[in-house]
């Protein structure tokens, strides 16, 4: 399991490196704004998930959490597009920023899937 953590950490670092390269290519710090959305995206889901163990229904509060998570993920891709459209960053910086976003979000999703899978196997005794 230790090698898995190292692999996920390396993939996440590569995604952040792409965003740093986007800043270098564009000669501005604007693409680094996207990194804030990477860190803010999981918090609405964590804070708004269903705490009631007796009910399997999703509540309005959980739907709001899912909506806000989607908003942060969408903004992680939309902000570089808006910056490129307004000629604040170049097309190369847009490509680096998008590659970083895809890498980071894919790493987070794979990480959550991988470790939730192990938790499900442990609970089936």
UniProtKB/Swiss-Prot annotation:
The chain crosses the membrane at residues 5-25, 28-48, 64-84, 95-115. The keyword Thylakoid does not apply. It holds the Pfam family Vps55. Keywords: Endosome, Membrane, Protein transport, Transmembrane, Transmembrane helix, Transport. InterPro entries: Vps55/LEPROT. Belongs to the OB-RGRP/VPS55 family. This is Vacuolar protein sorting-associated protein 55 homolog. It comes from Dictyostelium discoideum.
